[in-house]
Swiss-Prot record:
The protein's name in its UniProt record: Oxysterol-binding protein-related protein 1D
Tissue: Expressed in roots, leaves, stems and flowers.
Transmembrane intervals: none
Ranges annotated as biased composition (Acidic residues): 344-362
Keywords assigned by UniProt, alphabetized: Coiled coil, Lipid transport, Lipid-binding, Transport
GN (gene name): ORP1D
UniProt record, GO biological process: lipid transport
UniProt cross-references to Pfam families, sorted A to Z: Oxysterol_BP, PH_11
Matching InterPro entries: OSBP_sf, Oxysterol-bd, PH-like_dom_sf, PH_domain
Coiled coil, from the record: 290-321, 735-764
Species annotation: Arabidopsis thaliana (Mouse-ear cress)
Gene3D superfamilies xref list: 2.40.160.120, 3.30.70.3490, Pleckstrin-homology domain (PH domain)/Phosphotyrosine-binding domain (PTB) (2.30.29.30)
Protein family: Belongs to the OSBP family.
Chain ranges of the PH domain: 92-229
Amino acid sequence: MNPLCCIAPVSIDDRTNPVVAKSSNHHLGLEAIPVSKHASKPSFSTQASWISQDQLERLSSEVVDDVNLDGKDASSSSNKGCFFFGNCVGAGAGVAGIMYKWVNYGKGWRARWFELEDGVLSYYKIHGPDKIVMNPSREKGVRVIGEESVRYIRKASCGSSNRLGASAVAASRPCKPFGEIHLKVSSIRASKSDDKRLAIFTGTKTLHLRCVSKENRAAWVEAFQVAKDLFPRVASGDILPSEDAVVSTEKLREKLLQEGVGETVVKDCEAIMLSEVSVLQNRLKVLTHKHIILLDTLRQLETEKIELEATVVDETKEHDSCCGQGRRFSDFYSVMSEVSASDSEADNESQDGADVESDEDDVPYFDTNDILSAEAMRSASYRSREAEGNGSIYDKDPFFSDRLQIPARIPQYPYVRRRDNLPEPKEKEKPVGLWSIIKENIGKDLSGVCLPVYFNEPLSSLQKCFEDLEYSYLIDRALEWGKQGNELMRILNIAAFAVSGYASTEGRQCKPFNPLLGETYEADYPDKGLRFFSEKVSHHPMIVACHCEGQGWNFWGDSNIKGKFWGRSIQLDPVGVLTLKFDDGEIYQWSKVTTSIYNIILGKLYCDHYGTMRIKGGSNYSCRLKFKEQSVIDRNPRQVHGFVQDNRTGEKVAILIGKWDEAMYYVLGDPTTKPKGYDPMTEAVLLWERDKSPTKTRYNLSPFAISLNEITPGMIDKLPPTDSRLRPDQRHLENGEYESANAEKLRLEQLQRQARRLQEKGWKPRWFEKDEEGNYRYLGGYWEAREKKDWDRITDIFKKQQQRNSLSSSSSSTFL
C-alpha cells in the first residue's frame, strides 16, 4: 500500500493539482456525491468540512510556523475540521492526518503521519515538512483530518515545486510504513480524562495516540468505527452447524443399485454413512462452541489490557523528592487504618486489584518499598536490634530490653554435605505451549488435568510442604521468647514464619508433581533440629497431610488445594488449617491465603499471593496479616502488612511490614497514636530476611529446595518404597531425561487411576487418620519402622523396585 509520505510533492499547477476545484462555485468532491457507492455505509462526522480553492489559497499564503514534533505545544494548534482532497465520499475513502504517538518516557509524544485505508491504519515517521506529500495517483480519495495536516501538505507542495524531476522519481519508490494496525481485529478506546487521547489495542501491542484537538479525535474515532463496520462481527449463531441439516443418500442408493448391490446392503451403507456424518456434525458443534468461547475470552482480555496499559502510561515516572518524606509518614499511618478497615471473612475473597479506570488519576496506596529503603533501616544500629525488643516505645513490659538467649546446640550427629545444584540435564528440553494444553480446561479443577512433564519441577507436593519449614529457626526463636514470658515476641516470630513459607515461590513457574495415593516423604534434618513426614491421604479430593517434630514444638496440618483455570490465570485456593503446638501447651493456628498464576496466555508468567491470614492462639495476643494483591501498576508488589492485637484491651501493640519474598519487620506500639511528624521506621526491627541464592538455578529452586529430592549416603536402604525420592518420573526429570520422564509419568498416571477405586473400597492412609473435626493427625510409628526397616506392609506404589539399586550407586553426597 502506497503511503502518503515520502512521495513526490503535489503540483500547484491548476491542470495537475487535484486540490484545485473544477469551478469557482463547486466545492471539492461535491460532484461525486450522487454516484457514491457507499451510500449505505455510516457517514462521517459533520465536523468534516469541504475545502474550497479560496480556502486552500488562504492556507498556502499563511505564514505557517514549523510544527513542534515533540508534541509539547500540540494542544495550542488550531483545528477546525477535516478536509477532502479530490473525489472523496463515503466509507470507502482513505483517511490521513497527523497524530501524536506515545514512544517512551525518554522521547514522549512524537508526531506521526497516519493513513487509514481498507481497514488498515498505517503510520510513518515525519522527518521534515517535505516528507508529508501525497501520491498524485491516490490523493483524489483522501480525507485529511486537521488543518495542521493540510498545512504540512501545502507547505510541502510550495517548497518542492522547483524539484519536480526528483519528485517524480520519489513517487515511483513507495515508502514502507513504520507500523500497521488492522482495525478488524483491534479495539479502540477513547480516554475519559483527556478529550484528545485514544488508544488502539491489537491483542499484542497498544498504540497510545493524542490528537491536536477533541474535534480531531472525534473525527478519527468515527473514521475507525466506520472502517471496523466494513468487517462486521459474525454472530455466534451464524457459524454454528444447522440443527436441521439433512444428508441425502439418494445418489449413493442409485449408484449401489446400478452396481447390483442388494437392498439390505444399501440400507446398511446408508445407516453407516448417516451415523458417521452425525458424529462429525456433533464434533463440529463442540469445536465451534469452543471457538466462540475462546474468541469471547480474547476480546475480554483485549479490553482489560487496554485499560491496564493505558493506566501505566498515565502513571508519573518520577515523584517530587520534597514530598517523599511526608508521603512516607502518611503511607505508614495508613497501614493501620487499611488493615483494620474490615475484620470480616470477606477479605479472603479475591480482590480485583487490576480493576482500575485506565484514564483516571492514580489513587494513593501504601508503598512498602518507600519504608524498606529508608536510611534508618540500613544503619548498623538497626541491624543490631534484630533479636531485641524496644522498651523505649513499649515500656509496659521491662523484659523487652533483654536480648533473646538461645542455647547453643552441640552437634551429636555426622554432618551431611548437601548438594547445591541439580544434575546437568542429559537431554534438550522441548518447548511446549501451555495454552495449547489447558485451553480445553477453562473453569475446571486443575488437580485432575494431566500435563506433560515439561510443566513440572522435580519436586512433589509432599516435598513442597516441607519447603515451608525452611526458616524453622523462627519457631525455635518463638519457643525461647515464650520461655522468657514474652508472648508478644512469640507471636511476632510465628507471623514471620507464616510469611516466610511463600518466599521460595518467587520465580517458580513450574508445578510440583501430584503425589500418588499413599506416596510419602520424609526429611530428617538434625542440623535444623527437626524431622518431617508427609503422606497423600486422599486422591479425590487431593489432600496431603504432614507432621513435623522440632525441639520443643510440633507442627502439623493438611492441605486440600482447589485450583481452577479462568482463561488468563490459574487460581489456587488452599483449604485446611496449619497448627503449631509448643511443649508449654500453647497452640497457634492459621490458614494459607489464595495463590494465583497470571499471564497464562500472553505476557510474563508470575504468581501472586493475596488475602488475609489470621493467626489465633495463646491467651493474650492475636495477629492479622494482609497480603496485598498485585496489580499491573504496582511499583512494589508482594507487600504484606498487619498488626498484633491485645485480646484483653483490643489495642494494637505492634505492626508488621514487609514483603513475602524479601523480609518482614515489626514496630512495637501503635504509631497512629504518636504525635504528628513521628517517624515509626526509626524503630523498625528485622524479624526475618530471605536467604537469596547466589546463582540462578534450574527451575529457580533455592539451595534448600535443591536438597529436598537428594538421596544422601545410607538413606536408600532406610526409605520405604513409597518415598517421593524413589518416584521414577520425578527422578528422570531431575536428571534431564525428559523422554523417560514423560513415559514414566504416563505409566504412573495409569496406576493412579486405580487409586480412586481403592479409595472407594475403603482404603485408609497408613500413617494418618481423621480426628473428630475432620482433620488428619499423625498416628506415629513411622520413625520407629524406619529404624527397623519394617516395610513389609507397605506397597511398592511405583512398581519399580529395581530403581533402588541404581539410585544407591549414583548417590554423590558424602558424610564429613
